[in-house]
Amino acid sequence: MKILAIKLLDYREWTERLGYDREWLIQKIQNKFMMKIHEIASQYNTFPLQLRFDNFLMIADGITTTQLAYMINDMQENLPVRIKSCLGYGKTPLEAQWNASICLNNQDDNEIKEYTDEKIAALHFDINFNTETLKYTSVYDSFIEITNIYVNLSRFLYKIGGILQYLGGDNYLGFISTESVNKVIEEFSDDNKIKVGIGIGKNARTAIRLATTSLEKIRNNREKTWHMEEE
């Protein structure tokens, strides 16, 4: 699988130049440029895992090296600092991002090598009855629960070579290799708290769309805890 790691250079120095009354401005600018990055990524059928804001990952399967080069250039034009990127390859998203991260920290120029494309398995997780619990708990306690679930899901996916992004509300987006799909099904087939829509596609955007389609079918069915759609 292919993962593009992207690092914003001199990001801390840029934030410090904004003065002491800067946190609101940093959040405003971060959200503004991430909105633009999501827009650019969608045009190339990928999806950014924004993670730390100053470092993020993109699923790159199904995208040519030429397209990646154009995408990186488009992102650079919309960011307040220079960026550095490197493409990593591995049997799983976790391994691919490790290799991309090592490459990112050990080479001077943006590097895009040719790697084999693999199908992508996207996972759209949703917590059952979480919206209802807001009637009986505080906003902050609900956030703590959401965070704890995120940690537990992250640990599970890490064990099987996957990566995870919190989407907001009670939704999470994961990526795994297609070989690990059965492990996810086994883990959540009897779970009455979490449902997972699984999508398998040739690129990240397609896989995510299919995962969301699967999740909607689970919600409509109300009997299953998982469903899978494949391109």
UniProtKB/Swiss-Prot annotation:
Going by the UniProt record, its keywords in alphabetical order are: GTP-binding, Hydrolase, Nucleotide-binding
Please list the GO biological process terms of this entry: biosynthetic process
| Catalytic activity, reaction form | GTP + 3 H2O = 2-amino-5-formylamino-6-(5-phospho-D-ribosylamino)pyrimidin-4(3H)-one + 2 phosphate + 2 H(+)
Q: Name the source's superkingdom.
A: Archaea
This molecule's function is given as: Catalyzes the formation of 2-amino-5-formylamino-6-ribofuranosylamino-4(3H)-pyrimidinone ribonucleotide monophosphate and inorganic phosphate from GTP. Also has an independent pyrophosphate phosphohydrolase activity.
Pfam families cross-referenced by the UniProt entry: GCH_III
Which EC number(s) does the record attach to this protein?
3.5.4.29
**Matching Gene3D superfamilies:** 3.30.70.270, Nucleotide cyclase (3.30.70.1230)
Q: Which organism's genome codes for this protein?
A: Saccharolobus solfataricus (strain ATCC 35092 / DSM 1617 / JCM 11322 / P2) (Sulfolobus solfataricus)
Q: Know the name of this protein?
A: GTP cyclohydrolase III
InterPro entries from the entry? GTP_CycHdrlase_3 (IPR007839), Nucleotide_cyclase (IPR029787), Rev_trsase/Diguanyl_cyclase (IPR043128)
User: Which terms does the record give in the GO molecular function aspect?
Assistant: GTP binding; GTP cyclohydrolase IIa activity
Per the similarity annotation, which family is this? Belongs to the archaeal-type GTP cyclohydrolase family.
